[in-house]
Each structure stands twice: as structure tokens, then as C-alpha cells.
């Protein structure tokens, strides 16, 4: 008999206890945050591990388990969160849906990436997704020494005539749509979900919005940072053309780093497949700490 059970009504108290046992806590592992995304949630649970996932339908109409936008990686939680064998057992115990595509933290010792292969009556694969993190140990001066020469030049150009101010999710989202919205496919419902999630974290004291303002209080760049344990996570950002010209995002993140040193241990820039963004994060000394993506198609005759 499997030690795992699937529940469509996760116990929030149990979930919080499991979250507390995880060495790296992420804001989107908490049920309060996940509920803001407006998704139907389920979890695979045992005594020592919880694996959350969203349940929905694809654009072709079939049921699937997935991780939505706004929750880059979900779990695993619990004492066995870093045990690769237990994670493999959990993945095998997931409901027999046609498609499963999950993102999660990569346990220590997880096997190397593997392309599509046949396993237990289904095709599956797992691969590493990039995620950039900056350790905030030590002094700001030491961190600054780790900046790339390009980042230091951009920072020198950006200094002066910029102010650090609190902003709000509505303003940040509007500037994102105006200036970056055409570059990205924004899923239906994502706007309301992301705003709700940001306001939830603000009200919980687990997030803040900051902006760089130029002359005449001109809005140049903004970031939303979520806080979870020892981790500060750059969840959302936007910049204007004027902000790009004046290197305002470089200035704004540097200002955040000066404040964050001694408060958190990690600044998590989140993942990106865009080479330009990756270089930007690496310019502050961030290194790639990949997470795990797993995808499976079950054979139709295995479906309930």
C-alpha cells in the first residue's frame, strides 16, 4: 500500500508545519499565497513529505497537473524534502492524469538530467531550469567587489538624480504592461492573480514594492520583493525606456542589496531562459542554482 495520499483539500496547519521543516522556504509554498492565484490545488502527502500541485485542464481540454505562473517551483515540503528517493516515490504516486508537468526544488544528489524515456507506462523527462541567487553573507563592500565591471560602470552612470521610494502593485503592473507587456505572452487571469498575490504578501508583511524615481518624480523602474525566512525573492519587476537609459534597474537592485545585507542570506532573482537577463543577474555576482522540472505523459490506457 502506498504511503502517499492525494488530497484536494490540503490542511493548512499541516502544510505550514511541513513548510517550516524545509531548509529553503519559498513564499509560494504557503497556502495563503497559492490561494491568491485562483487555481484548484491538490497535494500528495505522506508523513514526511508534501508535494503540492495545481489541477486544471489544458487548452485541449484534458486534465493535467501543473505549476502555474507565479509559483515557479512548488515544494517538496517536509522532513524528506531533500531526499531524492522519496521525491521519486512521490512522483510515481501522483494521480494518473494524461499530463503532469511540475517544477520543484532539486534535492541534493538528484540524478543528472534525462531526456524523454519510457517508464512505468508513460513517457517522462526531467531537466534543470536556471535560477540565479546571490548570497548576502558578509559586507556590502565585499559583495560590491563581486560585481562585474559592466555592472559597476552602469551603477556609476546611474548614481544621482534617482530616489528610492515605496510603490504599489497596481502601479508596478501598469508600468510592466506599458513597457514589457508586448514582449511576453501574459496568460489569461494572470494579472488579477499576480496583483492579489502581491497585495496578500504586503498585508502579511512578507513583501514590498520599491521604485526608482527620476527628476520630477518620474517613474523609472520598480521591483516587488517577497520575503520568506532567510530568502528575499525578486518576484516581479518593470522598467520604462527612460529607466533603461539611466540604468535605473541596476541602481534599484543595488540599493536593495545595501539594505538586504544582514537581513536575509539569499537574494533570489528567480529563473530566466533569457541570456540578457541571466547576464544582468550574474553582473551582481549571482550564480546559477538550478531547480528541477519534471514532465510526464501517461499512456491513455493507464488513465482511470
Regions found by a protein language model. Name each.
Residues 73, 99, 129-131:
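Extracellular structured ligand-interaction cores
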Residues 57-73:
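Conserved acyl-donor/pantetheine-binding loop and adjacent beta-alpha core of acyl/acetyltransferases
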Residues 45-52, 98-105, 164-167, 266-269, ...:
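A structural signal for short, well-ordered beta-strand segments and their strand-loop junctions
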Residues 86-92, 196-303:
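Aromatic (often tryptophan-rich) hydrophobic motifs at membrane interfaces
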Amino acid at each position: 500500500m502506498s504511503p502517499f495520499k492525494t488530497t484536494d483539500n490540503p490542511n493548512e496547519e499541516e502544510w505550514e508545519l511541513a513548510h517550516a521543516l524545509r531548509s529553503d522556504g519559498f513564499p509560494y509554498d504557503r497556502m495563503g499565497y497559492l490561494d491568491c492565484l485562483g487555481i484548484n490545488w491538490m497535494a500528495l502527502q505522506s508523513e514526511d513529505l508534501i508535494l503540492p500541485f495545481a489541477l486544471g485542464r489544458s487548452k485541449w481540454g484534458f486534465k493535467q497537473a501543473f505549476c502555474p505562473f507565479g509559483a515557479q517551483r512548488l515544494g517538496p515540503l517536509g522532513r524528506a524534502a531533500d531526499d531524492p528517493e522519496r521525491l521519486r516515490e512521490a512522483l510515481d504516486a501522483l494521480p494518473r492524469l494524461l499530463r503532469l508537468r511540475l517544477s520543484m526544488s532539486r534535492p541534493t544528489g538528484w540524478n543528472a538530467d534525462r531526456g524523454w524515456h519510457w517508464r512505468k507506462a508513460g513517457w517522462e523527462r526531467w531537466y534543470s531550469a536556471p535560477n540565479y541567487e546571490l548570497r548576502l553573507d558578509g559586507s556590502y563592500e565585499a559583495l560590491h567587489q563581486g560585481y562585474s565591471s559592466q555592472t559597476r560602470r552602469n551603477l556609476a552612470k546611474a548614481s544621482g538624480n534617482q530616489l528610492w521610494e515605496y510603490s504599489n502593485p497596481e502601479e508596478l503592473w501598469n508600468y510592466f504592461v506599458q513597457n514589457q507587456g508586448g514582449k511576453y505572452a501574459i496568460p489569461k487571469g494572470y494579472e488579477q492573480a499576480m496583483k492579489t498575490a502581491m497585495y496578500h504578501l504586503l498585508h502579511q508583511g512578507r513583501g514590498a514594492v520599491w521604485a526608482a524615481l527620476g527628476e520630477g518624480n518620474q517613474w523609472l523602474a520598480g521591483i516587488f520583493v517577497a520575503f520568506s525566512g532567510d530568502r528575499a525573492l525578486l518576484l516581479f519587476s518593470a522598467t520604462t525606456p527612460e529607466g533603461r537609459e539611466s540604468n535605473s534597474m541596476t541602481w534599484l537592485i543595488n540599493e536593495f542589496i545595501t539594505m538586504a545585507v544582514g537581513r536575509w542570506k539569499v537574494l533570489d532573482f528567480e529563473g530566466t531562459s533569457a541570456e540578457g537577463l541571466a547576464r544582468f543577474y550574474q553582473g551582481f555576482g549571482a550564480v546559477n542554482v538550478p531547480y528541477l522540472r519534471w514532465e510526464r505523459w501517461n499512456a491513455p490506457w493507464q488513465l482511470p
